[in-house]
Regions:
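Protein kinase glycine-rich loop
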Residues: 16-22, 27
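Conserved N-lobe loop of protein kinases adjacent to the ATP-binding glycine-rich P-loop
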Residues: 31-38
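AlphaC helix of the eukaryotic protein kinase fold
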Residues: 45-67
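Activation-segment/catalytic-loop signature of the eukaryotic protein kinase fold
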Residues: 79
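Conserved short submotifs of the Hanks-type protein kinase catalytic core
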Residues: 83-97, 101
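Activation segment signature within eukaryotic-like protein kinase domains
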Residues: 116-117
Length: 163
């Protein structure tokens, strides 16, 4: 975004460009001006922000993920509401989704596929041991970092095991 069109979200997050769009929110690359680091900001669509059911689901996503500190899970740093807009601030993961990688490269080498699967299993096992079930594991919610790491994202329809 140009300086003229620069958007500062919640007085702290300088939005740069859209990274993706899902069924209930849009994710943008931003800079956390307070901590001077890149972050991903997920903003609930305005049409859904008036529905308390969607807002509660969004809040549960933030809360579930924020309590899961694991190297294979995208970290959540912040969540809140600003002028009727609900948002989640997450770790920015530079890389591609597993879906994009499979589309671009086709089949993975079996060793790499096994590594990715083991990392996903580690993340989901950790979440499960901490009372959270993801419920939407798919290649589009698995991020592959530029250095070969794996991060599970989007706990949007996660639920507590006690639910």
């Amino acid at each position: 975004m140009s300086q003229q069109n620069q958007v500062i979200f919640n007085g702290r997050y300088e939005l740069h460009r859209r990274l993706g769009r899902g069924g209930m929110a849009e994710v943008s690359l931003a800079r956390d001006q307070l901590l001077d680091r890149p972050v991903a900001v997920k903003v609930l669509f305005p049409a859904l922000a008036t529905d308390q059911g969607f807002v509660e689901r969004f809040r549960r996503e933030a809360q579930a993920a924020a309590n899961l500190q694991h190297p294979n899970i995208v970290s959540v740093f912040d969540w809140g509401e600003a002028n009727g807009t609900y948002f989640i601030v997450m770790e920015y993961v530079e890389g591609l989704t597993l879906a994009d990688t499979l589309r671009d490269e086709g089949r993975l080498h079996p060793d790499r596929a096994a590594e990715i699967t083991a990392d996903i299993a580690a993340a989901l096992g950790f979440a499960h041991r901490n009372g959270v079930v993801h419920r939407d594991v798919k290649p589009g919610n698995v991020l592959l970092t530029r250095d070969g790491g794996v991060k599970v994202a989007d706990f949007g329809i996660a639920r507590a095991i006690s639910d």
